[in-house]
Amino acid sequence: MTTEDLIELGNSALFNTYNRGDKLFVSGKGLYLTNNDGEEYLDFVSGIATNILGHANEKIVDAVTKQASTLMHTSNIYWNKPSIELADKLVNYKGAGKLAKVFFSNSGAEANEGALKLARKYGREVNGEHCTEIITLTDSFHGRTMATLSATGQPDMHKDFQPLLPGLNYVALNDSDALKAAVNENTCAVLVETIQGEGGINSLSDEFVQALKELQDNGLLLIIDEVQTGMGRTGTLFSFEQFGLEPDIVSLAKGLGGGFPLGAFIATDKVADHFNPGDHGTTLGGNPLGAAVGNAIFDEVMDAGLLDNVAARAEQLNRGLQQIADQTGAVTELKGLGLLIGVQFKDKVQAADVIAACYDEKMLVVAAKHNVVRLLPPLNVTAAEIDEALEKFGAAVEKVAE
């Protein structure tokens, strides 16, 4: 079928919930995607920070093939070896701090949903039934289930789905005074992203980090959403390591499965012990197939020098982006950490226009805000691929800056 015929069929059979445009890809290898017409694109979206080893990575393909031919699913009324092994790796990673217990899910939204439930149960049992409120940040994004939508500090996403889950309160990113003022006897936790991916690639300030530490010292739980920042994207396995934070609960997804549906939340013993059989569950989370993929990805990130590669390629990419900014005058700021990079443009330049210009250069990028474009290559991107991306992106920016 032609691309047009397939898209027409998709429009007739699928919910109209995504602005997919006219791109339809049929295969991928490494950093490249091939569309239905045989055209190849350099992929700096990576499934939105998900395909951290690129497309059709041999380690992932081998893990899927071997495990699928052995055991795919049993449910969580039984133990399975791959999930035990992956949980052990996550909690024994040197930067995990006091994180000690893992619950596997299928997505980031599910991971955050479980984290919110756990925080509320902890608050009720430790401080009383009134202690169930959770503070989150404006411009945050935590998912699209009712609880995670309620935790997401973006009113435009709320308007058609009221009433939201009560007990979620928002403060502005990096407003330490507002954060402290929002805390009361009903507050059990604060939920933050170290870097707001969907919100514009905005990072926690040093002052705000200190305020979070003080609240944590005074008994509030700190939940960190690492769905987009985790699994090495920022240069450490968890981004919170670079902010000097030690969360009570952390959520993971995206890179954890490298394109396979896999999420998790991890908690310290003192918090995790408040969940008992029947408090939370999932049919498919932590299935042997997904966990086998997670094991392969974890091993590759930790053993193949990928974290060092993130640092080197991030420096190379930022250096080239700064040259583009200087040459075009269209860029106001480069933001982010590691290979989670946001390019903020002047207000007259829309992210959609940059994305369209990149399409013309056979390169894929994704928006974060109306004037912020994200660059999210896999962690194993090479120096040559960074050079190619800079050439394509530079040509696109020159076009929109005219």
Roles of regions detected by a PLM:
Residues 1-402:
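Conserved N-terminal phosphate-binding loop of PLP-dependent enzymes in the Aspartate aminotransferase
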